[in-house]
C-alpha cells in the first residue's frame, strides 16, 4: 500500500457556491410588491402584514410600501407598511 497518493493527486479542489442569504431590504426601505426582503434557511424572521413566504422561507413583499422589522410573541416579524 502506497502511503503517498502519487503524482499530481490531491484531496482538495472543491468549493461550493455562496448562498447569498440575508436581509435584502432593511427597515424603512421602500419596496415594490414582489421584492425579496429576506432570504433565509428556516424561519429566523416570520412574515407579518403584507409579507408572504416562499417554500424556501424567503420573505417577500405582497404590496408596495416600506419595510418594518419588529417582535411579536417572541418572534421576529417583518411587515410592509403601505
UniProtKB/Swiss-Prot annotation:
GO terms for cellular component: cytosolic large ribosomal subunit. It holds the Pfam family Ribosomal_L27. The keyword Nucleus does not apply. GO terms for molecular function: structural constituent of ribosome. Residues 7-19 have a biased composition (Polar residues). PANTHER family: LARGE RIBOSOMAL SUBUNIT PROTEIN BL27M (PTHR15893:SF0), RIBOSOMAL PROTEIN L27 (PTHR15893). This is Large ribosomal subunit protein bL27. The lineage of its organism: Bacteria, Bacillati, Actinomycetota, Actinomycetes, Bifidobacteriales. The gene is rpmA.
Amino acid at each position: 500500500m502506497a502511503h503517498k497518493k502519487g503524482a499530481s493527486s490531491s484531496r482538495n479542489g472543491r468549493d461550493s457556491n455562496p448562498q447569498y442569504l440575508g436581509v435584502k431590504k432593511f427597515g424603512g426601505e421602500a419596496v415594490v410588491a414582489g421584492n425579496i426582503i429576506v432570504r433565509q434557511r428556516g424561519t429566523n424572521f416570520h412574515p407579518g402584514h403584507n409579507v408572504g413566504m416562499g417554500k424556501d422561507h424567503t420573505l417577500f413583499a405582497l404590496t408596495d410600501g416600506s419595510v418594518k422589522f419588529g417582535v411579536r410573541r417572541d418572534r421576529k416579524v417583518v411587515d410592509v407598511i403601505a
